[in-house]
Amino acid sequence: LLKITNKIKVINSYSVKMPKTLSNKMVELSKTKKNLFLYPTKELREADEEFTFETVNVVKKLLKKSKLRNSDIHALGSHGQTIQHRPFSKKPYSLQIGNPKIISNLTGITTIGNFRQTNIKNGGSGAPLTPSFHNFFLRDKTKNRAIINIGGITNITLLLKNKKTIGWDTGPGN
C-alpha cells in the first residue's frame, strides 16, 4: 500500500502464499502452446476466477490491517498474473488472469488493469509501467540515463534529455 506524491511512501504491506492448486493451474496454463487469448479454455476461466477472488481477499485483508476503508484508496493497480506473453508473434498479445472489473466491483476501489495488452495494442512490447515510473522519479533534464530492471523479464528504460522516454523488454531476468 503506497502513498505517491513527489515521492513514494510505503504505508503497509500484506502477502499470502498462493494456494498450491491455483499455482499448479497457472504453471500448466503457461505451458499451453495454443493462444489462450483468442481461444480461452475452461481451465483458464477457472484460474482467472480463483486468482481474482484471491486478489480481492488480499486487498480486503490489507485494508483491515491498515485500518483503512476502500474510500480511503484512490486507485488499485492490478497487474494480474501473466499466463502467456507473446508481444512479437504474428498476432501479438499478453494474457493475464485477475479480472480488474470484478476486483473493482468486490472491493469498491477503482481498479486499473490490462496494462500489458493495452501497451501491445499501442505498439509496445507489453512493459508500460516501468518506463513511466522511471520517467517520473528518475528523469534529469541535464543527463541521459539508462535504467535496467531485472525481474522475471528484464527491461530497460532510456531517459534521454529532451527526448521521449522509451523502454522495452530485453529477455529473461532472475
Feature annotation, model-predicted:
Residues 1-174:
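Short acidic/glycine-rich loops and adjacent helix/strand connectors
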